[in-house]
């Protein structure tokens, strides 16, 4: 079974702890798949912490993916993470992903 299949399997079974190692894989596609999978579990603080750390990564594609994953989060914690990072972010694509995530979160809290 390949890494992408493992990510899909662990995500389907809710085995979040098994997803974390894939976030730092040498294969970017594996990293992106793991980040996307973590987005399904944003109600867990360890997931929020991991996604928050990825927003500091040097890779803009990974930062965009983390912002997109955070869009499924509920509550003010995700908003504060995104707002804080948005103030520091220099890449326009990542900024847009963060704004989209914020809009998505806010639309559910009306």
Region spans (language model):
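Eukaryotic acidic, Ser/Thr-rich intrinsically disordered low-complexity regions
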Residues: 87, 94-110
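Amphipathic alpha-helical scaffolding segments comprising HEAT/armadillo-like alpha-solenoid repeats
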Residues: 10-23, 43-56, 75-87, 108-110
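N-terminal intrinsically disordered, low-complexity tails enriched in polar/charged
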Residues: 1-13
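Short, contiguous, helix-prone interaction/anchoring segments in small proteins
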Residues: 29-40
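Alpha-helix N-cap/helix-start positions at coil->helix boundaries
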Residues: 13, 28-29, 45, 60-61, ...
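Conserved hydrophobic register position within alpha-solenoid helical repeats
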Residues: 3-6, 34, 66, 98
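Charged low-complexity stretches with an acidic bias
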Residues: 58-84, 90-93
